[in-house]
Amino acid sequence: FTHSKVGKPGTPEEERTPLNACVWRYHPVRHEFEVFAHGTSNPWGLDYNEHGEFFTTACVIPHLYHIVPGGRYQRQAGQHFNPYTYEDIKTIADHAHYAGDIKDNAHWGPRAQGGLNNASTDMMGGGHAHCGLAIYNGPQFPAEWRGKFIFANLHGHRLVTDYIEPKASTFVGHHGSDFLRDNDHWFMSVTQKVGPDGALYITDWQDKTTCHRTMPELWDQTNGRLYRISYVPVGVQALADEKKQSPKGYTPTAPFDLAKETDENLAQLAVQSENAWF
């Protein structure tokens, strides 16, 4: 993997922080940069739950990890900087979102023009490559969605879900149902985030080439979309359809300024668990 040495402009090489796949953090006030955990592969999704536990999704290697400070996690390639890392931390997932061999759904295999060659892979979630992560802790979706992990499956052109339960000092991740399937082969969600209003916001890369294809003539640089997904109860939707109106299930969050709140109100916001933004 590409190595980096991070430091402010002018920092000598020996004083920089080396990276070769990791999760890092930066303190915006103290201007401090540090590696939080080492390893994984293409960790393109990172979020934390209501208890402050961090999780990441990885691409190609097993997809779900519980991230703890100082942890050293499974790599796709290369070596950990610490030569005494005799065994690294593996995935918490008890499943995959594909069946058979990775090459059946990868760019180097028979899948050249898209689509899924393996019906079992389609049923399991679409493929081996994942991107983004949103742990739903918002006020809008039904209660059964709280704590669900929502992330993209690139080859499956969909959003999939996992859910966790405690196990010893960590968790085990279980296979959930698909959240969204798109009928557009160009659909590739890169980021999923829960907004202050409780809606799910997702980006769509929109490109013909799903993954790893160095074919500039096929790259599309004119599209790209941002979606907001809101929960509307079935009855409300049916009534809206009958009246040929837009459903009234989305209510914008009223403007707020936490700097104007009293200490008592701030304390109440700090301990509530309905909305992770407050």
State where each predicted segment sits.
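Beta-propeller blade termini and top-face loops
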Residues: 1-268, 274-278
